[in-house]
Protein backbone atom coordinates (compact mmCIF):
# COMPACT_ATOMS: atom_id res chain seq x y z
CA UNK A 1 0.00 0.00 0.00
CA UNK A 2 1.06 3.59 -0.64
CA UNK A 3 0.17 6.42 1.70
CA UNK A 4 0.52 9.96 0.38
CA UNK A 5 0.27 12.91 2.74
CA UNK A 6 1.02 16.62 2.76
CA UNK A 7 2.05 18.90 5.61
CA UNK A 8 1.49 22.66 5.46
CA UNK A 9 3.35 25.18 7.59
CA UNK A 10 2.76 28.92 7.55
CA UNK A 11 5.27 31.58 8.56
CA UNK A 12 7.67 30.78 11.37
CA UNK A 13 9.02 27.30 10.85
CA UNK A 14 8.95 26.32 14.53
CA UNK A 15 5.48 27.64 15.33
CA UNK A 16 3.71 24.65 13.76
CA UNK A 17 0.37 26.41 14.10
CA UNK A 18 -2.74 25.97 11.95
CA UNK A 19 -6.14 27.65 11.84
CA UNK A 20 -5.12 30.41 14.22
CA UNK A 21 -6.81 33.76 13.56
CA UNK A 22 -4.03 35.83 15.10
CA UNK A 23 -1.39 36.34 12.37
CA UNK A 24 1.06 37.67 14.96
CA UNK A 25 1.56 34.13 16.24
CA UNK A 26 3.22 33.21 12.94
CA UNK A 27 5.90 35.88 13.21
CA UNK A 28 9.37 34.41 13.87
CA UNK A 29 11.52 35.75 16.71
CA UNK A 30 13.86 37.38 14.17
CA UNK A 31 11.23 39.38 12.32
CA UNK A 32 11.37 39.40 8.55
CA UNK A 33 13.58 36.29 8.39
CA UNK A 34 12.81 32.70 7.43
CA UNK A 35 14.81 29.61 8.24
CA UNK A 36 14.18 25.90 8.36
CA UNK A 37 16.00 22.64 9.03
CA UNK A 38 14.39 19.76 7.16
CA UNK A 39 15.34 16.13 7.90
CA UNK A 40 15.44 14.13 4.67
CA UNK A 41 15.71 10.76 6.36
CA UNK A 42 12.89 8.37 7.18
CA UNK A 43 11.92 5.56 9.52
CA UNK A 44 9.89 3.74 6.86
CA UNK A 45 10.59 3.16 3.16
CA UNK A 46 9.47 6.27 1.29
CA UNK A 47 8.99 6.57 -2.46
CA UNK A 48 9.22 10.36 -2.63
CA UNK A 49 9.59 13.28 -0.25
CA UNK A 50 9.06 16.85 -1.46
CA UNK A 51 9.67 20.06 0.46
CA UNK A 52 8.48 23.31 -1.07
CA UNK A 53 8.61 26.87 0.25
CA UNK A 54 7.38 30.12 -1.30
CA UNK A 55 8.90 33.51 -0.59
CA UNK A 56 8.32 37.07 -1.78
CA UNK A 57 10.24 37.67 -5.00
CA UNK A 58 12.47 40.29 -3.35
CA UNK A 59 13.47 37.97 -0.47
CA UNK A 60 16.83 36.21 -0.87
CA UNK A 61 17.45 32.79 0.64
CA UNK A 62 20.52 30.58 0.89
CA UNK A 63 20.34 26.82 1.28
CA UNK A 64 22.48 23.71 1.31
CA UNK A 65 21.75 19.98 1.29
CA UNK A 66 24.03 17.96 3.58
CA UNK A 67 25.03 14.30 3.74
CA UNK A 68 23.38 13.28 0.50
CA UNK A 69 21.78 14.57 -2.67
CA UNK A 70 18.37 15.80 -3.75
CA UNK A 71 16.73 17.39 -6.78
CA UNK A 72 16.28 21.14 -6.28
CA UNK A 73 14.74 23.99 -8.24
CA UNK A 74 13.68 27.62 -7.96
CA UNK A 75 10.81 28.97 -10.09
CA UNK A 76 8.99 32.30 -10.30
CA UNK A 77 5.24 32.24 -9.82
CA UNK A 78 3.59 35.66 -10.09
CA UNK A 79 5.20 37.79 -7.37
CA UNK A 80 6.64 34.79 -5.50
CA UNK A 81 9.70 32.56 -5.65
CA UNK A 82 9.10 28.84 -5.17
CA UNK A 83 11.93 26.62 -3.91
CA UNK A 84 11.36 22.88 -4.26
CA UNK A 85 13.50 20.00 -2.99
CA UNK A 86 12.74 16.33 -3.64
CA UNK A 87 14.29 12.95 -2.92
CA UNK A 88 13.12 9.58 -4.27
CA UNK A 89 13.33 5.99 -3.01
CA UNK A 90 14.34 6.76 0.55
CA UNK A 91 15.17 3.88 2.87
CA UNK A 92 15.36 4.00 6.68
CA UNK A 93 18.70 5.09 8.09
CA UNK A 94 20.74 2.25 9.55
CA UNK A 95 21.54 3.22 13.10
CA UNK A 96 24.59 2.13 15.07
CA UNK A 97 25.25 2.00 18.81
CA UNK A 98 26.57 5.32 20.16
CA UNK A 99 26.45 6.94 16.72
CA UNK A 100 26.41 10.70 16.25
CA UNK A 101 23.15 12.59 16.02
CA UNK A 102 21.23 11.90 12.80
CA UNK A 103 21.49 15.59 11.93
CA UNK A 104 25.24 14.97 11.62
CA UNK A 105 24.97 11.77 9.60
CA UNK A 106 21.74 11.59 7.60
CA UNK A 107 20.50 13.76 4.69
CA UNK A 108 19.14 17.16 5.71
CA UNK A 109 18.23 20.46 4.11
CA UNK A 110 19.09 23.79 5.73
CA UNK A 111 17.94 27.19 4.54
CA UNK A 112 17.92 30.74 5.83
CA UNK A 113 17.15 34.23 4.59
CA UNK A 114 19.61 35.64 7.15
CA UNK A 115 22.87 36.43 5.30
CA UNK A 116 25.45 35.77 8.04
CA UNK A 117 25.77 34.42 11.57
CA UNK A 118 26.94 37.89 12.61
CA UNK A 119 23.46 39.22 11.82
CA UNK A 120 21.97 36.63 14.16
CA UNK A 121 24.53 37.46 16.85
CA UNK A 122 23.71 41.18 16.70
CA UNK A 123 19.98 40.45 16.84
CA UNK A 124 20.37 38.13 19.85
CA UNK A 125 22.39 40.77 21.68
CA UNK A 126 19.92 43.58 20.98
CA UNK A 127 16.89 41.45 21.90
CA UNK A 128 18.12 40.81 25.42
CA UNK A 129 19.63 44.25 26.03
CA UNK A 130 16.37 45.91 24.98
CA UNK A 131 14.39 43.58 27.23
CA UNK A 132 16.61 44.34 30.21
CA UNK A 133 17.44 40.70 30.89
CA UNK A 134 20.57 41.52 32.91
CA UNK A 135 19.48 44.61 34.84
CA UNK A 136 21.14 44.71 38.29
CA UNK A 137 19.19 43.85 41.43
CA UNK A 138 20.26 45.22 44.86
CA UNK A 139 19.85 41.96 46.77
CA UNK A 140 21.66 40.03 44.03
CA UNK A 141 24.47 42.60 44.01
CA UNK A 142 24.84 42.07 47.76
CA UNK A 143 25.28 38.33 47.14
CA UNK A 144 27.83 39.01 44.39
CA UNK A 145 29.90 41.26 46.66
CA UNK A 146 29.79 38.60 49.36
CA UNK A 147 30.98 35.91 46.94
CA UNK A 148 33.90 37.81 45.41
CA UNK A 149 35.14 39.31 48.68
CA UNK A 150 38.77 38.27 49.12
CA UNK A 151 39.09 36.92 45.57
CA UNK A 152 42.20 38.39 43.93
CA UNK A 153 42.20 37.25 40.29
CA UNK A 154 39.58 37.46 37.57
CA UNK A 155 39.47 33.66 37.28
CA UNK A 156 38.84 33.29 41.01
CA UNK A 157 35.91 35.69 40.73
CA UNK A 158 34.55 34.05 37.58
CA UNK A 159 34.81 30.60 39.15
CA UNK A 160 33.05 31.46 42.41
CA UNK A 161 30.20 33.21 40.61
CA UNK A 162 29.79 30.41 38.07
CA UNK A 163 29.63 27.72 40.71
CA UNK A 164 27.26 29.62 42.97
CA UNK A 165 24.81 30.02 40.10
CA UNK A 166 25.30 26.40 38.99
CA UNK A 167 24.69 25.07 42.50
CA UNK A 168 21.85 27.38 43.55
CA UNK A 169 19.68 28.01 40.48
CA UNK A 170 17.79 24.75 40.02
CA UNK A 171 16.98 23.40 36.60
CA UNK A 172 13.19 23.36 36.18
CA UNK A 173 11.58 23.25 32.76
CA UNK A 174 8.45 25.25 33.47
CA UNK A 175 6.70 28.03 31.56
CA UNK A 176 7.27 31.34 33.31
CA UNK A 177 5.22 33.79 31.28
CA UNK A 178 6.42 36.46 28.89
CA UNK A 179 10.02 36.16 27.83
CA UNK A 180 10.14 32.63 26.46
CA UNK A 181 12.20 31.61 23.45
CA UNK A 182 15.28 33.70 22.72
CA UNK A 183 14.51 36.33 25.37
CA UNK A 184 16.19 35.59 28.70
CA UNK A 185 14.18 36.25 31.85
CA UNK A 186 15.39 39.15 33.94
CA UNK A 187 17.59 39.14 37.02
CA UNK A 188 14.75 39.79 39.47
CA UNK A 189 12.69 36.82 38.28
CA UNK A 190 15.66 34.44 38.21
CA UNK A 191 17.06 35.47 41.59
CA UNK A 192 13.64 35.37 43.24
CA UNK A 193 12.52 32.04 41.78
CA UNK A 194 15.98 30.39 41.96
CA UNK A 195 14.97 28.05 39.14
CA UNK A 196 14.57 27.89 35.38
CA UNK A 197 15.93 26.29 32.24
CA UNK A 198 19.38 26.73 30.74
CA UNK A 199 18.76 30.29 29.56
CA UNK A 200 17.65 31.35 33.06
CA UNK A 201 20.72 29.80 34.66
CA UNK A 202 23.00 31.37 32.03
CA UNK A 203 21.16 34.69 32.40
CA UNK A 204 21.68 34.61 36.16
CA UNK A 205 25.42 34.12 35.68
CA UNK A 206 25.61 36.96 33.15
CA UNK A 207 23.85 39.27 35.61
CA UNK A 208 26.19 38.22 38.42
CA UNK A 209 29.28 38.74 36.26
CA UNK A 210 28.12 42.20 35.19
CA UNK A 211 27.43 43.21 38.78
CA UNK A 212 30.98 42.08 39.58
CA UNK A 213 32.37 44.39 36.89
CA UNK A 214 32.80 41.90 34.05
CA UNK A 215 31.59 42.20 30.46
CA UNK A 216 29.38 39.16 29.89
CA UNK A 217 26.82 38.11 27.28
CA UNK A 218 24.55 35.18 26.36
CA UNK A 219 25.43 32.61 23.71
CA UNK A 220 23.48 29.91 21.88
CA UNK A 221 24.82 26.42 21.29
CA UNK A 222 23.73 22.98 20.12
CA UNK A 223 24.53 20.24 22.60
CA UNK A 224 25.01 16.92 20.86
CA UNK A 225 25.03 18.04 17.24
CA UNK A 226 26.97 20.15 14.76
CA UNK A 227 25.88 23.67 13.77
CA UNK A 228 26.36 24.35 10.05
CA UNK A 229 27.48 27.52 8.28
CA UNK A 230 23.92 28.24 7.08
CA UNK A 231 22.54 30.63 9.77
CA UNK A 232 19.40 28.71 10.68
CA UNK A 233 18.37 28.17 14.30
CA UNK A 234 20.07 24.87 15.05
CA UNK A 235 20.30 25.55 18.80
CA UNK A 236 18.98 23.79 21.89
CA UNK A 237 21.00 25.28 24.75
CA UNK A 238 21.95 28.67 26.20
CA UNK A 239 25.32 29.45 27.80
CA UNK A 240 27.35 32.55 28.69
CA UNK A 241 30.57 34.21 27.57
CA UNK A 242 32.73 36.54 29.66
CA UNK A 243 35.37 38.91 28.34
CA UNK A 244 38.74 38.36 30.00
CA UNK A 245 41.37 41.03 30.63
CA UNK A 246 43.27 39.89 27.52
CA UNK A 247 40.26 40.75 25.35
CA UNK A 248 39.17 37.19 24.55
CA UNK A 249 35.78 35.70 25.32
CA UNK A 250 35.60 32.63 27.55
CA UNK A 251 32.52 30.37 27.34
CA UNK A 252 30.84 29.35 30.61
CA UNK A 253 28.05 26.84 31.14
CA UNK A 254 26.57 26.93 34.65
CA UNK A 255 23.83 24.46 33.64
CA UNK A 256 26.30 21.62 33.11
CA UNK A 257 28.73 22.23 35.98
CA UNK A 258 26.76 22.01 39.24
CA UNK A 259 28.84 20.44 42.04
CA UNK A 260 31.91 19.86 39.84
CA UNK A 261 35.18 21.74 39.31
CA UNK A 262 34.77 22.64 35.64
CA UNK A 263 33.57 25.99 34.31
CA UNK A 264 32.76 24.54 30.90
CA UNK A 265 31.75 20.89 30.78
CA UNK A 266 34.32 18.67 29.07
CA UNK A 267 31.34 16.89 27.51
CA UNK A 268 30.95 20.02 25.37
CA UNK A 269 34.36 20.03 23.69
CA UNK A 270 34.55 21.21 20.05
CA UNK A 271 30.95 22.36 20.19
CA UNK A 272 29.67 25.24 18.06
CA UNK A 273 28.22 28.30 19.75
CA UNK A 274 27.12 31.82 18.78
CA UNK A 275 27.72 34.67 21.25
CA UNK A 276 25.28 37.57 21.33
CA UNK A 277 27.95 40.28 21.63
CA UNK A 278 27.65 44.01 20.75
CA UNK A 279 30.19 43.83 17.92
CA UNK A 280 28.58 40.72 16.45
CA UNK A 281 30.27 37.35 16.09
CA UNK A 282 30.66 34.55 13.63
CA UNK A 283 29.99 30.96 14.68
CA UNK A 284 32.58 29.85 17.26
CA UNK A 285 33.77 26.46 18.50
CA UNK A 286 34.67 25.49 22.05
CA UNK A 287 38.25 24.40 22.74
CA UNK A 288 39.47 20.91 23.48
CA UNK A 289 39.83 20.24 27.19
CA UNK A 290 43.51 19.77 28.03
CA UNK A 291 44.58 16.27 29.18
CA UNK A 292 45.80 17.61 32.52
CA UNK A 293 42.21 18.59 33.34
CA UNK A 294 41.20 14.95 33.53
Regions found by a protein language model. Name each.
Residues 1-5:
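Short Pro-Gly-centered flexible turn/kink motifs
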Residues 199-289:
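Hydrophobic/aromatic-rich core segments of domains that either
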Residues 188-191, 198:
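Noncatalytic alpha-helical scaffolds and linker/capping helices
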Amino acid sequence: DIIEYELHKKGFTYALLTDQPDEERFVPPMRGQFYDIVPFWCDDPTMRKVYSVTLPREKEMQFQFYQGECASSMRYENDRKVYTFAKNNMMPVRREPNMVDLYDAAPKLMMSSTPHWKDKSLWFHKTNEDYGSFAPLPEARQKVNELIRGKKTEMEKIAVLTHWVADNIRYAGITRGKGEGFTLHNTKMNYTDRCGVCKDIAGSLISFLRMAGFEAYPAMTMAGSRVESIPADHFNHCVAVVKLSNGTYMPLDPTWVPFCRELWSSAEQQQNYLPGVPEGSDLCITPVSAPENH
